[in-house]
Design a protein with these regions (language model features):
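Ligand-binding cleft/hinge of the Venus flytrap
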Residues: 59, 72-92, 96, 118-123
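Ligand-binding clefts/hinges and TM-proximal coupling segments of bilobed small-molecule sensing domains
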Residues: 74-87, 126-129, 152-180
Length: 180
């Protein structure tokens, strides 16, 4: 079921969905409200700019720069922490369109979202810059009461990692080997 990122935890808690599988960081704040599965990949946040950009090289360069980010994400929080003027959107696709149309100067996004977009035929006029900010690790989320589903997902993840399926899929979609 497609929905805005900032609506995922409320949708889970109200019973509209059973599981969040949406690149969510297992932060301490979120752990207060949901159960998380084991981390299924390590991620971080990166900056995407147009290839002709020669002024933004790191998060420190975002001060007073117009940055696109998905609403309700840690990416938006980090952009704000570095002093960016943040335009928040419901979907990352909107961020890419804003960057392409020059209505924002950069996009802050999950590293794997950027890798997927650029590796799978996204805009060839974009590039990533700087070192990513590492995240707490990406997990799926269930309600606090649904530890049975959490355990089933953990078991499935263990099996996918053990038989090599996880590594194969990760390389296919992100163009690189998974990190621990």
């Amino acid at each position: 079921k497609a929905m805005a990122f900032d609506g995922l935890i409320p949708a889970l808690q109200s019973g509209q969905i059973d599981l969040i599988a949406s690149g969510m960081d297992a932060t301490p704040e979120r752990r207060e409200h949901v159960n998380f599965t084991q981390t299924y990949f390590k991620d971080g946040y990166t900056i995407v700019v147009r290839k002709d950009n020669d002024t933004i090289h790191s998060f420190d360069d975002l001060k007073d720069i117009t940055v696109g980010a998905q609403m309700g994400t840690k990416a938006a929080d980090y952009a704000k922490q570095y002093g960016a003027v943040v335009k928040e959107f419901n979907q990352n696709d909107q961020c890419w369109m804003e960057l392409e149309s020059h209505t924002c100067d950069a996009v802050v996004v999950n590293r794997v979202v950027a890798l997927y977009f650029l590796n799978q035929g996204g805009n060839k006029a974009f590039k990533t810059v700087g070192e990513p900010i590492l995240s707490a690790g990406v997990s799926m989320a269930t309600t606090k009461e649904n530890s049975e589903l959490t355990a089933k997902v953990d078991k499935a993840l263990d099996e996918l990692k053990a038989d090599g399926t996880y590594a194969t899929l990760y390389k296919k979609w992100f163009g690189t080997e998974p990190t621990d």
